[in-house]
Amino acid sequence: MPKAKANNIEIEYDTFGDPSSEPLLLVMGLGSQMIRWVEELCMMFVDKGFYVIRFDNRDVGLSTKFEEAGVPDIMKEFMARQRGKTISPPYTVEDMADDAVGLLDALNIEKAHICGASMGGMIVQIIAFRHPTRVLSLTSIMSTTGNPNLPQAKPEAMQLLLKPAPAEREAYIEESVKRYRILYGSGFPYPEDKFRELAAVLYDRSFYPQGMARQLFAILGTENRVPKLVTIKVPTLVIHGGDDPLVPVEGGKETAASIPGAELLIIEGMGHSLPFETWPQIVDSIAKNADKVNN
């Protein structure tokens, strides 16, 4: 897969479909490599007429790592933030939004439909108000607004963020299978074998938990985005699982309520995951939202 110079770093990316089609930039979440946007799902977007771009965020996968920044003590920083103290992550979620726009620059793409999941939802929200001329439509999936007064993650889901990943391959795979199960939601059968295969591929491609810690530090440093979300003017779709234990559905509801004209799609039984049974509905909904640009 190719690399691009973007925002003074190197971004690993991948594309699907016809470059002359309307671009759709897919942005993944915390500690997640771009291959979590699996090829089958990317090709479903291609079949809807999109030119699909997926990429590794900074500090994950095969993009630039920020090793010189060290590994933060997340619990200490979390407690400091809870006490109202200012924290200073080595980079911000705004920097990550600028990375994504820098990738569009490198690919000579003036405007794109943007879709992000979880932390990726935060990133695309920021792109939409920070770089409004670059956005055709916005989809925010299983994300939130940064409002500290919203319901927080369930304790068992929050623990997943704070518990270190095992360094040994087989232990990592088994732990990942357990973690995915907790996040998956109760409404769909859990495909354990698929997630075991995915965990192995992710480990072999890039095992780098230090980057996830720094990304989480960046998330801890975010502010309430509601005052800026109200300025977004592009067609917006917010998708959320009704059974999300990590980012409760109230985060999706407030995102949709904050962006003028936004449509909200709540998928009952879906957790903090994208079960393959939901893909047709999700792809159709994103394509319909994108169609609003031309209508």
Each predicted region: which residue ranges?
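Short glycine-enriched nucleophile-adjacent loop
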Residues: 121-132, 138
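Catalytic active-site module of serine/aspartate enzymes centered on a nucleophile-bearing elbow/loop
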Residues: 262-295
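Alpha/beta-hydrolase
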Residues: 153-227, 254
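Acidic catalytic loop of the alpha/beta-hydrolase fold
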Residues: 243-247
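Conserved HGGG/HGGXW glycine-rich cap/lid loop of the alpha/beta-hydrolase fold
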Residues: 9-83
